[in-house]
A protein has these predicted regions:
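Long, low-complexity serine/threonine/glycine- and acidic-rich segments characteristic of extracellular
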Residues: 266-358, 373-380, 388, 394-479
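Hydrophobic alpha-helical segments, especially N-terminal targeting/anchoring helices
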Residues: 251, 309, 462, 519-523
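Surface-exposed, proline-enriched loop/turn segments that connect beta strands in immunoglobulin-like
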Residues: 226, 233-235, 376, 486-491
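Proline-centered linker/hinge motifs at extracellular inter-domain junctions
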Residues: 219-221, 362-374, 455, 484
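Glycine-centered coil/turn sites that cap beta-strands in beta-rich domains
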Residues: 478-522
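Short, acidic/polar linear motifs in exposed loop/turn regions
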Residues: 252-254, 325, 399-401, 451, ...
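Cysteine-dependent hydrolase recognition
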Residues: 1-307, 311-320, 328-330, 338-360, ...
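Contiguous beta-strand segments within globular domains
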Residues: 11, 232-269, 380-412, 495-503
Length: 526
């Protein structure tokens, strides 16, 4: 489907189990930086496994937080997921950061990606006796990948490095706004002078429709004003707790405003990039006996994600900058995506000229937390009702100054299931403000494989002033082993002459076909 997820690009790197793995991590980082430079409208998410804490379990070393980060990012959506590292028929990385079971559990039916795995035997489709992780990812009826560029046999690291870097150039059409099909990008990669003499190029295949292209939107969306000043010349800095008004227009590639363009814009404002580092989980050292670490820049936190109407090619939106921005002044990023109402046209844009930092010392006071309304699966749900084992949380929010998504310490939008504070669900990335109204917003979050029975879900949110509110909802996950039961059957009006309505409760989470028969007191069917 259409949506701002089409501006997202995701890379995942293996950790460093041995010294020679260092180049895998560094290559992934190099590709990420190349993508940022060549396609600055893309929001590049880096998941370097070694920047997360590794856990030791009875089954071996694991990265549960990496697994969750991959799941969440895939369900939020990305046009490409590029994994570089070790892998095999059962998944990627020896720590099983995304395994064959995960490939079947993924639930992203409207945000299908191109999954790139230059690794060993991930999609060994030529063995009918053994189904592999890549095949399950492609077959996934709830989503998965719409296309894969993947391997059927073991591939050497040096070949993988050159192949991955070369592939990115063609897949994203560096230097051009004209995209080619995914399969054509692979063909050109294999015929590139860097790769054409490598026999192992024959181990990499395209799975999917050979005519399919990446869903990259057309250029361009441009920011023209910040707080009524021209964006190109303004010296304004967006301070914490200060109001912001951003104006712009949707144009063609030549910069002409599309005066007949009417639709909806999604704007995502990022704080300054964050400096991060890997942590050397496996204690692997280089030839100088120093722990192998890698510094890298990651996207800043989202300080606002909202929507605005586009009318005759023009748009404007407002918000209050959260208290939790990093105070030091620097350039953030505005990421823009819009969809035209009457056609299949969508556009994208970006701007790095916005400066963020400092604090508005004259901000009005606010001591009231946001209002939260919770539902499960649909907004007709009443607390205590029945759901399936994979329910979707729906949450609506309201606050006079807007909801905080800037991820200050302890200030995330969170959900806690059954009081388990060791397993907190962070929901910031799922929140979007309403169209033309930064005070209202909503999110939906899919839960997976919940146990049958009664559950209590607690959602906590903060406004941009860091006032918090919590709200609970209870729901009963239907036990598939139970027989169907109907209770509280009633009708109104009763008695009736020619019309009545029936209500009843049932213990099924499925859509039901209901047959009603009405008899007279003498037993005659009406």
């Amino acid at each position: 489907t259409y949506g701002s997820w089409r501006n997202n690009f995701m890379l995942v790197s293996d950790d460093i189990d041995k010294r020679s793995d260092r180049i895998i991590q560094e290559t992934t980082e190099d590709i990420a930086e190349d993508v940022k430079a060549e396609k600055p409208f893309l929001n590049v998410l880096k998941i370097h496994a070694d920047s997360f804490v590794q856990e030791t379990t009875s089954g071996g070393d694991r990265y549960s937080l990496v697994n969750k980060a991959i799941f969440d990012a895939l369900e939020v959506g990305a046009i490409v997921v590029n994994y570089f590292g070790h892998g095999g028929e059962n998944g990627i990385a020896s720590e099983r950061i995304f395994d064959i079971i995960n490939a079947q559990e993924l639930n992203n039916p409207t945000k299908l990606n191109c999954f790139v795995t230059v690794t060993c035997e991930y999609t060994k489709f030529d063995n009918p006796l053994r189904e592999t992780a890549g095949e399950f990812l492609f077959w996934n009826k709830k989503g998965g990948a719409i296309s894969l560029i993947t391997t059927t046999r073991r591939i050497y690291v040096n070949v993988g490095i050159n192949f991955n870097k070369t592939l990115s150039q063609y897949l994203l059409s560096y230097g051009s706004d004209e995209t080619i099909s995914i399969a054509e990008a692979l063909r050109r990669t294999k015929n590139d002078p860097m790769i054409s003499n490598q026999p192992q190029r024959r181990l990499v295949f395209s799975i999917g429709d050979p005519a399919l292209k990446l869903p990259i939107a057309d250029p361009d969306i441009r920011i023209t004003k910040l707080n009524n000043e021209a964006i190109a010349s303004t010296t304004l800095v967006l301070n914490a707790l200060s109001p912001a008004k951003i104006e712009g227009n949707v144009t063609n590639a030549q910069g002409a405003v599309l005066n007949n363009y009417n639709g909806v814009l999604t704007a995502t404002i990022y704080d300054k990039d964050v400096e991060r580092s890997t942590i050397g989980n496996d204690g692997t050292k280089d030839s100088n006996n120093e722990l192998i670490l890698m510094d890298f820049d990651a996207l800043g936190e989202v300080i606002f994600r909202g929507q605005a109407s586009v009318t005759n090619g023009e748009f404007a939106f407002e918000f209050i900058v959260p208290r939790d921005i990093t105070v030091a002044e620097g350039n953030g990023k505005i990421s823009l995506y819009s969809k035209e109402n009457a056609t299949l046209l969508d556009n994208r844009g970006y701007n790095y000229n916005i400066k963020i930092g400092g604090v508005n010392l004259n901000a009005p006071e606010d001591t009231i937390g946001p209002t939260i309304n919770l539902f499960m699966n649909d907004e007709n749900f009443v607390s205590g009702g029945i759901t399936n084992e994979n329910p979707t949380l729906l949450a609506n929010f309201y606050d006079e100054n807007g909801i905080n998504t800037a991820s200050g310490i302890g200030h995330d939008i969170t959900a806690i299931l059954d009081g388990d504070e060791t397993n907190v669900f962070r929901l910031n990335d799922y929140y979007t403000a309403a169209i033309d109204d930064y005070k209202r917003g909503s999110l939906s979050y899919p839960f997976r494989d919940l146990s049958p029975g009664l559950h209590t879900l607690t959602v906590k949110a903060w406004d941009v002033y860091n006032n918090s509110s919590t709200q609970d909802i209870q729901f009963i996950v239907f036990d598939k082993d139970e027989s169907l039961e109907l209770t509280n059957v009633l009708n109104y009006p009763n008695p009736f002459i020619n019309y009545t309505e029936f209500w009843f409760s049932h213990n099924s989470s499925d859509v039901l076909d209901v047959s009603i028969q009405i008899f007279t007191i003498s037993g005659k069917l009406i």
